[in-house]
């Protein structure tokens, strides 16, 4: 009789623990970084970096602007769906998150944020330290709703999706003279960025995170804004901006291969998420993927004061952010890379 009770308790315990893994792998998605992932945290900040105004959100449910920088869902939402977790990743700073929201993951990212300490302060958005502090607050809430043991299991098995560097290179390095004043060449600056990114993930690791999906930056030289200001008469991609982006990505890629072997990251897994080449493939072969415009944004530009009628035909929705369809297109490969690298 005792052995039967033990068996039942073991099976029940196994079942309870397994509920922390969706499809046998990941119980939650926790997103950090910039506007590629931000699902509405900036709504509650005193900053001009806002995505909760028209024409953002026009493809979202009920055609409402939620704080996402795009026409609909952003990359963090789509990754959450691709991992089998949920279709919408809520912002941590929204007024209310249910226990279910907390157990399956939230977003800490902030549009305009960067890993360079200068970047977030320039735009008055959440700094890396702010996001880490929010993560600590999230863990306290998760422990209160799920219990300490289950909360620890959720955090250690969650995918930690990190997007940092786009604003640092695009704004702090190319858009302002701050990097030049600090005497930083592209090589030195991208080395510092990669180091700051590693330090940020170590702070998340120290709170229990173990599975990191580290996103490279997108082709910054091919953004509609870059093409207009630096692309010349034919508004081509800017080679130098792309070269710096690739330089940074190369250092991130190398880091994801070595950090997991360091004593300070014992038990952690890292996978590099190649945003640059997957999006560049869509830009170069846009017609093959069902787009009709790869150079201009659908809205919010000098060339598109009135929003286009169909954002699904545009690779970019505004002057820097991909459209939801572009995110869905590149996610097919990238989500599989995350699954393979962190399973």
From Swiss-Prot:
GO BP, sorted A to Z: lipid catabolic process
Active-site residues (renumbered): 35, 318, 321
InterPro entries assigned: GDSL, GDSL_lipolytic_enzyme, Lipase_GDSL_AS, SGNH_hydro_sf, SGNH_plant_lipase-like
Keywords per UniProt: Extracellular matrix, Glycoprotein, Hydrolase, Lipid degradation, Lipid metabolism, Secreted, Signal
Top EC class of this enzyme: hydrolase
Coiled coil: none
GO MF terms, alphabetically ordered: lipase activity
Classification via CDD domains: SGNH_plant_lipase_like
EC number: 3.1.1.-
Glycosylation: residue positions: 23
Domain of life where this protein originates: Eukaryota
Record keyword Lipid metabolism present: yes
Signal peptide range in chain numbering: 1-21
Tissue: Flower buds and pollen.
Family as reported in the entry's similarity comment: Belongs to the 'GDSL' lipolytic enzyme family.
PANTHER family per UniProt: GDSL ESTERASE/LIPASE EXL3, GDSL ESTERASE_LIPASE EXL4-RELATED
Physiological role: Required for the formation of pollen coats and male fertility.
Name by which UniProt lists this protein: GDSL esterase/lipase EXL4
Organism: Arabidopsis thaliana (Mouse-ear cress)
Annotated gene: EXL4
């Amino acid at each position: 009789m005792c052995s039967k009770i033990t068996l039942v308790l073991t099976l029940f315990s196994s079942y309870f623990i397994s509920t922390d893994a969706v499809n046998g792998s990941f119980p939650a998605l926790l997103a950090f970084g910039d506007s590629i992932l931000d699902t509405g945290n900036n709504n509650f900040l005193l900053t001009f970096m806002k995505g909760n105004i028209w024409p953002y959100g026009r493809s979202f449910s009920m055609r409402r602007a939620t704080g996402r920088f795009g026409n609909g869902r952003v990359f963090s939402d789509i990754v959450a769906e691709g991992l089998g977790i949920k279709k919408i990743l809520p912002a941590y700073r929204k007024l209310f998150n249910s226990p279910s929201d907390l157990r399956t993951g939230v977003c800490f990212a902030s549009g305009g944020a960067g890993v360079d300490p200068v970047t977030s302060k320039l735009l008055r958005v959440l700094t890396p330290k702010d996001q880490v502090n929010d993560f600590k607050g999230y863990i306290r809430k998760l422990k209160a709703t799920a219990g300490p043991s289950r909360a620890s299991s959720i955090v250690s098995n969650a995918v930690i999706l990190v997007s940092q560097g786009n604003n640092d290179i695009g704004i702090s390095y190319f858009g302002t003279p701050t990097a030049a004043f600090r005497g930083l060449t592209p090589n030195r600056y991208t080395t510092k960025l990669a180091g700051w990114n590693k330090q940020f993930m170590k702070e998340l690791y120290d709170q229990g995170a173990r599975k990191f999906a580290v996103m490279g930056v997108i082709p910054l030289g091919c953004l509609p804004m870059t093409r207009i200001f630096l692309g010349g008469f034919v508004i081509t991609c800017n080679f130098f901006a792309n070269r710096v982006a690739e330089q940074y990505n190369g250092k991130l890629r190398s880091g994801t291969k070595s950090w997991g072997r360091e004593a300070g990251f014992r038990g952690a897994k890292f996978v590099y998420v190649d945003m640059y080449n997957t999006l560049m493939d869509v830009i170069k072969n846009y017609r093959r993927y069902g787009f009709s415009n790869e150079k201009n944004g659908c809205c919010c530009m000098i060339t598109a004061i009135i929003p286009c009628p169909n954002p699904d035909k545009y690779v970019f929705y505004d002057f820097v952010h991909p459209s939801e369809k572009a995110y869905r297109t590149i996610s097919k490969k990238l989500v599989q890379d995350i699954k393979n690298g962190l399973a």
